[in-house]
């Protein structure tokens, strides 16, 4: 019997929405659980991109974004990684926008209630990303996100990594597509807002199990009070 493919998630996106930004898991430890994924860094300092077992940070405050490789001792307040194994691979041979490509991707899904890992390498006519700005305050994520910088790049080659989450797990993660991008030359990246792909290769991976871990040593998390309706509303605004 094949080894089950586990999606490893540290903390929940809902906790991040509530303003719990302190990193408590080292990136080096996180990478033991998967080679593809996403998240953010301590104090929500930019976007975390995990590709081929390496972790990158995309952040921006000026006219151009910055992408750097993340050291193993940096910490995350929230992240999700998976040992990506492509179950479906197809070539996208003509131009599509993100919504059109998502419909094609979903035609390969077996049902609607399993997580999926996603990896798309290609040439993009347009890539629109944002980066959450660093915050050490107790301001909620949606408030911080109002000032997040956005960047758009045309004619760029790179990789989208992401997780598709079923609706029944909304709150644990973001229902639907959560995608991050990094260019081949490591000069551009971030949380994907929208894109137009010219051509590329799409890989879809199965997920058999969810390994959900919690920051059990973090007193802020242990005693936090969550307003679920407000949290879901903030997730929809921010993501």
Predicted regions and their residues:
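N-terminal charge/polar-biased segments
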Residues: 1-16, 217-239
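Long, positively charged binding patches that form subdomain-scale interaction surfaces
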Residues: 99-163, 168-172
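Histidine-centered divalent-metal-coordination microenvironment in nucleic-acid enzymes
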Residues: 174-182
């Amino acid at each position: 019997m094949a080894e089950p493919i586990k999606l490893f998630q540290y903390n929940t996106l809902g906790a991040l929405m509530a303003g719990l930004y302190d990193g408590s898991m080292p990136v080096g430890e996180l990478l033991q659980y998967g080679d593809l994924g996403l998240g953010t860094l301590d104090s929500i300092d930019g976007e975390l991109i995990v590709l081929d077992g390496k972790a990158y940070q995309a952040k921006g405050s000026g006219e151009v974004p910055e992408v750097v490789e993340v050291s193993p001792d940096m910490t995350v307040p929230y992240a999700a990684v998976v040992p990506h194994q492509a179950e479906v691979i197809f070539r996208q041979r003509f131009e599509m926008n993100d919504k059109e490509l998502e419909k094609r991707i979903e035609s390969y899904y077996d049902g609607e209630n399993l997580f999926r890992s996603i990896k798309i390498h290609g040439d993009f006519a347009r890539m629109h990303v944002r980066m959450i700005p660093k915050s050490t305050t107790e301001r909620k994520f949606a408030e911080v996100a109002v000032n997040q910088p956005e960047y758009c790049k045309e004619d760029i080659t790179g990789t989208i990594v992401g997780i598709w989450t079923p609706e029944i797990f909304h709150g644990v993660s973001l229902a639907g597509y959560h995608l991050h991008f990094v260019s081949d030359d490591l000069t551009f990246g971030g949380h994907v807002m929208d894109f137009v792909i010219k051509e590329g290769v799409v890989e879809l991976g199965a997920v058999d199990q969810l390994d959900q871990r919690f920051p059990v040593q973090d007193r802020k998390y242990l005693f936090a009070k969550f307003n679920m309706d407000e949290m879901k509303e903030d997730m929809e605004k921010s993501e």
